[in-house]
Design a protein with these regions (language model features):
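Active-site region of the double-stranded beta-helix
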Residues: 16
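C-terminal, non-catalytic "cap/extension" segments appended to globular domains
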Residues: 3-12, 20-126
């Protein structure tokens, strides 16, 4: 595949990444707030709590007439409790490191324009 305008391709990729993180941040809010509420009161209707969080943070409506333990589809709750927000923390940390590399190694270049290919200074900085 030949890219006709590499700059437009880079800009589109950057926008897609930004949108993906915005959507993911809302999903992380659902998981974090659901788990917090679940541990505060494990006797409550957890499906209601789940859909309350989904509606509030993702803007999705619960299916009419559905009353199944949809929260159970997220196995993270059992296998790695109170962990899901770490995915977002990792994204935030990676973004901060990248911005710092752009500032320190690439003399203040905009982070969207920086790549690490053939740049040993990045390794030295790290």
């Amino acid at each position: 595949m030949k890219v006709v305008d590499p700059q437009a391709f880079d800009e589109t990729g950057t926008k897609m990444s930004q949108y993906r993180l915005l959507v993911f941040s809302r999903w992380c809010q659902v998981m974090l707030r659901f788990e917090k509420g679940m541990y505060e009161n494990p006797e409550q209707d957890l499906n209601k709590l789940w859909w309350d969080m989904v509606e509030k943070y993702q803007g999705l409506r619960r299916p009419a007439g559905r009353n199944a333990p949809d929260y159970g589809a997220k196995y993270h709750i059992v296998g790695a409790p109170v962990y899901y927000h770490n995915y977002m923390m990792g994204q935030l940390f990676a973004s901060q490191v990248h911005a710092t590399i752009a500032k320190e190694v690439y003399s203040g270049a905009h982070p969207d324009t920086v790549t690490y290919v053939n740049e040993p200074k990045v390794g030295e900085f790290m």
